[in-house]
């Protein structure tokens, strides 16, 4: 499922402000609401959906990297939906290597790594 920011993971600031994850604490424009008054994460989730990103929507690795970490994207490109070229290259290289290793694994090794029960 990739990053759980705003979906399965949240962070709460000392004043009750709710953020998608600990890395966004203090970045008020990414606040999802407040634990005392309510919150809405739907806008954030729509924003980080990899299928809504021009750069990622046609990428072969989109379902593996899911557009990289939203906070790292924001730090590197000032846009949570835009991964840096370096991040994309690194993710693709890692997944290419992992796929290559998986293809070379025997069925027995695959069963040992991912048991069915």
Regions found by a protein language model. Give the residues of each.
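Cysteine-cluster motifs in flexible loop/terminal segments that predominantly coordinate metals
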Residues: 50-97
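A broad, low-specificity signal marking well-ordered, structured residues that form hydrophobic/aromatic
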Residues: 10, 30, 86
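Short Fe-S-cluster ligation motifs
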Residues: 44, 82-117
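Short clusters of hydrophobic/aromatic residues that line enzyme substrate/ligand-binding pockets
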Residues: 3, 32-35, 88
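A C-terminal junction/extension of Radical SAM enzymes
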Residues: 1-26, 115-117
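Short capping/connector residues at structural and topological boundaries
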Residues: 8, 37-40, 93
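C-terminal accessory region of radical SAM enzymes
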Residues: 22-66
